[in-house]
Amino acid sequence: MNKEEIIQAIKEMKVTELVELVKALEEEFGVSAAMPVAAVGSPVAGAAAAAPVEEKTTFDVILKDAGANKIKVLKVVREITGLGLKEAKDLVDSTPKPIKEGVSKQEAEEIKAKLEAEGAVVEIK
């Protein structure tokens, strides 16, 4: 496995998997991934440098309200989640609830568009 393949594999990991990987690397090599305090500099400079790096890559799609057309929204929720009729109905009836978590921005926008087309109120976090 070369460097590019390793990087690609890391890109495809979920956040929880990345946390486990970092812990395993720390244990294996006896190091810490925490940045030393002396290297950070002033808190203001550290915060300014960290802000652009923290761009969100995974999003949660939250159904805020099913609207007047619950049956059509229910069908879309079942299509998106793969839930059974009862589970999807319970989810739609107990808004606000997350429909899909940890998805890409593009997928979140597509899900939001499908649900809003049926009259639902949707939020992406």
UniProtKB/Swiss-Prot annotation:
Zinc-finger recorded as keyword: no
Ranges that cross the membrane: none
InterPro entries named among the record's database cross-references: Ribosomal_bL12, Ribosomal_bL12_C, Ribosomal_bL12_C/ClpS-like, Ribosomal_bL12_oligo, Ribosomal_bL12_oligo_N_sf
Gene3D superfamilies: 3.30.1390.10, Single helix bin
GO BP: translation
Molecular-function GO term, any one: mRNA binding
One cellular component term from this protein's GO annotations in UniProt: cytosolic large ribosomal subunit
Residue runs in coiled coils: none
Keywords: Ribonucleoprotein, Ribosomal protein
A Pfam family assignment: Ribosomal_L12_N
Family: Belongs to the bacterial ribosomal protein bL12 family.
Function of the molecule: Forms part of the ribosomal stalk which helps the ribosome interact with GTP-bound translation factors. Is thus essential for accurate translation.
Subunit details: Homodimer. Part of the ribosomal stalk of the 50S ribosomal subunit. Forms a multimeric L10(L12)X complex, where L10 forms an elongated spine to which 2 to 4 L12 dimers bind in a sequential fashion. Binds GTP-bound translation factors.
Protein name, per record: Large ribosomal subunit protein bL12
Organism: Dictyoglomus thermophilum (strain ATCC 35947 / DSM 3960 / H-6-12)
Lineage: Bacteria, Pseudomonadati, Dictyoglomota, Dictyoglomia, Dictyoglomales
